[in-house]
Amino acid sequence: MALSLLLAVVCAKPLVSRAELRRIQALNPPWKAGMPKRFENVTEDEFRSMLIRPDRLRARSGSLPPISITEVQELVDPIPPQFDFRDEYPQCVKPALDQGSCGSCWAFSAIGVFGDRRCAMGIDKEAVSYSQQHLISCSLENFGCDGGDFQPTWSFLTFTGATTAECVKYVDYGHTVASPCPAVCDDGSPIQLYKAHGYGQVSKSVPAIMGMLVAGGPLQTMIVVYADLSYYESGVYKHTYGTINLGFHALEIVGYGTTDDGTDYWIIKNSWGPDWGENGYFRIVRGVNECRIEDEIYAVYLD
């Protein structure tokens, strides 16, 4: 009985607290930390369920040749010192969304990249919202609200395709188990699918990543998450506090730049809602593989 109560208390540990915030602020991080409304009633256990566990990531076989800087330079040369998808393609920008308690960051980031690159290439003349829910529920090589991985996700979008959010809206916000794969749109009409032409992994070269962003738009990446990220409000994030890896988190890289004091950064679109961070986005140090952000990055090819 005592052990059960102890486990319940551990699992109910709040993700954020003012005491922990003070400890972070005492370290004088190069970014602003605060109490995030998004996580004020979330436990650490619930937060972990929003992330991707290591056992949900497949062994990396190295079978997918990375896109090299030489290939990128054939697409864009010289590579500009800064790029922001929101400024370059304002007609394509959609608000940052909130995945809720479902561990579906893998789907939100992939669908974001898919739609943004379609718009950047002129396939869609304006921003179209594609369905995260269809991908979560129907990509059976992934784990629904319990995480997913890059290659099975992009394989699904290449061979099966994505439908629109108008057809299948997101319903797993408060779920930890994915809803069944729908046979028709929410209104009963047939599901129309839009396929990717293929996908590729970008090399770990920072210039190659920058060039691929400029050449075709946002890319998908993944980071290791530590406790301090949940407190992020603004600035260029650098891991400052917390030694425990809480899980992996898939994200959308939408640009890069350099601060006035010379700090290079990536611009990231998150899936924790528009009230977190910088209107749902955050910046993270570029060029030092901060939180493994430059380890594994994917681009989608479109007709």
Curated annotation (Swiss-Prot):
The keyword Signal belongs to this UniProt entry's keyword annotation: yes
Glycosylation sites: 41
Signal peptide: 1-19
Listed SUPFAM superfamilies: Cysteine proteinases
EC annotation from Swiss-Prot or TrEMBL: 3.4.22.-
Principal EC category: hydrolase
Keywords: Disulfide bond, Glycoprotein, Hydrolase, Protease, Signal, Thiol protease, Vacuole, Zymogen
Family to which the UniProt record says this protein belongs: Belongs to the peptidase C1 family.
Entry function: Thiol protease which is required for parasite excystation and invasion of the proximal small intestine of the human host.
Name of the featured protein: Cathepsin B-like CP1
